[in-house]
A protein has these predicted regions:
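N-terminal lobe of the biotin/lipoate ligase/transferase fold
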Residues: 2-174, 197
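Long, positively charged amphipathic alpha-helical accessory segments at protein N-termini or as interdomain linkers
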Residues: 2-36, 50, 151-181, 191-284
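Short loop/edge segments at beta-strand edges and connector loops
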Residues: 96, 183-185
Length: 284
């Protein structure tokens, strides 16, 4: 089996386990559903375990992907995206670490990436905020950048897009956690007076005509980040949705909800988005 075929097999096994997360599935059923041998299933399971996935196994019951797993994966995100928004899961690129998800997304946009293409990383080595300020991006966070095409959203000015993304993230956090984040200024989300999320919007235009070609929306969320390890100058000003390793939901689920919200809100008018934004905005 080639490396490419092996990767496809592993991805299919992971996708099957994600869609049955928390319950046992037999190796025979998995093999039949995917169209591979039971031996190939066994090899894929071992490879996934070596990557850190907690997969339990019991004789005569099969395999179960533990609910405790919180590894970001395209398969995991896709398992939480509803059928109406399936196209938002067609171009997910997940990395353990990148310099900047916005940089990766811009590279993809310049190569003609589709609307909704999403770059996601567990860590950024050179994360950026507005005015090129450093955005501290350790493990425990969600770092994602979405490519948006102007003909797919009802507005194109950076501030309007920032508001649109801010509302999408707020609504996702509200619906999944019950928390009520507010938008401080225009591009930062706060909970209980401390920053939980930053947003960076960048765009590219055709040189001769100045016509907008693409927009990249960068989102950085402290999910279950260890705030104690943040730089001293940040510790008192930031918070995390959950304590380290104790999230009540998976990162994949929150990412999926944000992508669904982007898809839904893109069909709204700028007036409607502004109304939702204003409800959540507070002055610094």
């Amino acid at each position: 089996m080639s490396d490419r075929d092996n990767k496809k097999t592993i991805d299919k096994v992971l996708s099957f386990l994600e869609s049955n997360k928390g319950q046992y599935v037999s190796g025979a059923d998995m093999a039949a559903s995917i169209g591979i041998s039971r031996n190939a299933v066994w090899k894929a399971i071992n490879e996934l375990r070596s990557r850190g996935y907690v997969i339990e196994s019991i004789t005569n019951k099969g395999y179960m992907l533990s609910e405790d797993n919180d590894i970001i994966s395209a398969e995991g995100i896709e398992s939480f995206i509803g059928p109406k928004h399936g196209h938002m899961a067609e171009h997910l690129l997940v990395y353990d670490s990148v310099d900047s998800t916005n940089n990766k997304a811009k590279e993809s946009a310049l190569k003609g990436a589709c609307h909704g293409t999403c770059i996601i990383a567990a860590r950024q080595d050179s994360g950026r905020g507005r005015r090129d300020h450093q955005f501290y991006s350790p493990e425990g966070g969600i770092y994602m950048s979405v490519v948006l095409l102007p003909d797919k959203i009802p507005f194109s000015k950076n501030d309007a897009v920032t508001a649109f993304i801010g509302v999408a993230v707020c609504k996702a956090i509200e619906s999944l956690t019950g928390l009520k984040p507010v938008i401080m200024g225009i591009n930062d989300l706060y909970i209980d007076g401390k920053k939980i999320c930053g947003i960076l919007i960048e765009s590219g235009s055709e040189f001769d005509s100045g016509i907008l070609q693409w927009i990249v929306a960068g989102i950085g969320i402290n999910f279950d980040s260890d705030i104690k390890k943040f730089p001293r100058e940040l510790k008192g000003n930031v918070t995390s949705l959950y304590p380290p390793g104790k999230g009540d939901m998976s990162k994949n689920r929150l990412i999926a909800k944000i992508l669904e919200n982007i898809d839904v809100l893109a069909k709204n008018s700028e007036k409607d988005i502004k109304k939702e934004f204003t409800k959540r905005r507070v002055e610094k």
